Amino acid sequence: MFLVIGDSYDERGSLRQVPHRLSLAMVDDGWILRNTLVWHKLNAKPENGKIKRWGTSYEFIFFFTLSTNYYFNMDKVRVPYLTEFSSGAPRHHKTDEKMNMGQQTNLHHPLGRVPRDFIGDDIVQTTLNNSDKFVPDKNLEHSATFPEKLIKPFILGTSIEGDTILDPFLGSGTTAKVSLDNGRKCVGYEISPVFVDTSFERCGQDMIQERVKVM
């Protein structure tokens, strides 16, 4: 399970520590916290210029599992290397060589390196979306929208075609669209009729009636 959650401030201007409190509560309840990813928003929402603190440009993404036996396909989320060569004495050597002149190199994977837990420029360069820019959809007016490319690696890395993806806060339908575009099904819950309509519009009537359930 991937959980994207931001923080908020109390009346004193202190962070409520919502993400940290929630993650601790879930671990206490039996969930296994695999990663705490940091989503760096390249186009963060502008803040009041009168605030007496730094502006916020990130949210936490928690990766939870319920057991030690879970599906994860690293090859779907690898990040291509920036160069075909790595530096090392006594001379430069190809990254796909295991040994060169007695010096051990990293055992580089042909599909790329393991992604980092800081998501910003990385997500632009994954093997899934080399040519796509990491920017939010500004045409959708929703308080908690996120880019399709943010969640695409999560879906492809932790599910296979034909699996059903659950989004209990469907919103504008980003999860549903990415799921459908990549051969998955989707079940979503949304209390706002406006955003249910938006989800239908984004996914297409034929696709959503067959492969998406909105409740």
For the regions a language model picked out, list residue spans one by one.
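Core catalytic lobe of class I
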Residues: 1-203
